[in-house]
Amino acid sequence: VPYLEISNIGGGGAKIQAVEGRPMGDIYVQVPQMNENGEYLVSDKGLYMNQTELQRVGNINPDGVGGLFSSFSYKNIFLDFSIDFRIGGDVINEMYQYSTASGLTPESLQFRDTEHGGLSYYYPGNNNASGVPVQVDPSLGAGPNGETVYHDGVILPGVVASTGEKNTRIIPAGYYYNQTYNWGTQPEQLTYRHSVFDNSYVKLRELTIGYQFPEKLISKLGMTRLSVSVFGRNLFYFYKALKNYDAESSVGTSWASQAVVGGSTTATRNFGVSLRASF
């Protein structure tokens, strides 16, 4: 058996595998084809064409994890804190994948209009269904026959697979995102390669500030120790490579499911008050 499939994400669009001769937990996804010159191959639809086999793009295992706990006190005031960290290890961000397909992420603003790099074009005869878009100057108010001019065009860098010529096919930004991101392995250009991210972080796990009452005061109450404190948990990240998502918002608790972001509840901060007494 050359490999074992540990996890299947998005109907086979991404997989976590244990491959003979490789560290366990490699991430495999569909990636675009290239020619011998390193240029992407573009279909007649204006979209990239994926290779037939999934390719390795990362590994879910971190290079290191750890934590730090420390406590300080001054007279009767004390402060405790704990910090957790993770170095390396990739995650597959399903939430990012599907949100980008729907135009809900900041990254999907690219090409949406002229301000964000979109090209201007029209469909001859306003034939949006089967017409080939024609690029025009952004200042043009309408096509030669009064056609609607759109400003959300994108031309993907590469060469047309069927001709070997430079790609000049304009496609709408929404079409590009929906056909490139999304769920599954179809259409042929869909890929999870943009949704694999480093998950390194340094996090303030817990912070406690409290006051310990003097022994001579509490001894009259029959106590040997009395303290009151306020605490907070999951307060913030000092550093987080995974932007806009909580680094611990995985779909499960197993070592493989922790490498998939999506479908979890919203991360929360917890605050509280603690009163501890010893008799």
Model-derived features with residue positions:
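Outer/extracellular conduits and scaffolds centered on Gram-negative outer-membrane beta-barrels
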Residues: 1-279
